[in-house]
Design a protein with these regions (language model features):
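Sec-dependent N-terminal signal peptides
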Residues: 4-14
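Sparse, context-dependent recognition of short Cys/His-centered cofactor- or disulfide-binding micro-motifs
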Residues: 2, 22, 117-119
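Positively charged n-region of N-terminal signal peptides that target proteins for export
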Residues: 1-4, 18
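Bacterial Sec-dependent N-terminal signal peptides
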Residues: 15-31
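An exposed acidic His-Trp-rich patch
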Residues: 142-155
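Structured domain cores in non-transmembrane regions
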Residues: 26-32, 41-145
Length: 155
């Protein structure tokens, strides 16, 4: 079982990854992870402004030749749209292009939890595509988002 704790910006998010099955071969293996996204944006940890919410959590399972976003680099149009308006459409188009190039194999989509709730999904990855990246907008904010960039599930 792998557990990852993230503390980002003004809220604390808990992402728990549990490897539930693995099939291994000589040079290739697959894994299924159960991913739970839990919002911890509440008093007394943080003041909760009116209308606070997360947007749909959108990402991908990919290889080391790409990333969804990277700290210190200019945001793509898709990342910018999620951060500024919560619009996931441009990021879906970007991920489609990355999949078409063979650098990603699937989407990661988690319905937005309430500020203090959680949602869970299963993700499938393999030794050729071991990275997960995703993001969600923190609202109401000018352009804040949180997420994971190129986390290696096989490390």
């Amino acid at each position: 079982m792998k557990t990852i704790f993230l503390s980002l910006f003004i809220c604390i998010l808990f992402l728990s990854c549990e490897k539930s099955s693995v099939s291994e071969g000589s040079a290739y293996s697959e894994a299924v992870y159960s991913v739970e996204f839990t919002g911890k944006w509440k008093a007394p940890e943080f003041g909760v402004p009116s209308g606070v919410h997360f947007t749909t959590i959108l990402g991908m399972i990919h290889n080391s030749q790409t990333y969804q976003w990277k700290e210190g680099e200019l945001a793509s149009w898709g990342v910018e749209r999620i951060a500024e308006s919560g619009n996931t459409g441009p990021m879906v188009i970007e991920i489609d292009s990355i999949v078409a190039l063979g650098k990603a194999i699937s989407y990661v989509v988690i319905n937005a939890p309430t500020p203090t709730g959680s949602n869970k999904t299963n993700i499938y990855c393999n030794s050729n595509y071991p990275y997960i990246s995703f993001e969600t907008m923190l609202a109401p904010t000018p352009d804040w988002f949180t997420g994971i960039s190129s986390f290696n599930l096989y490390a």
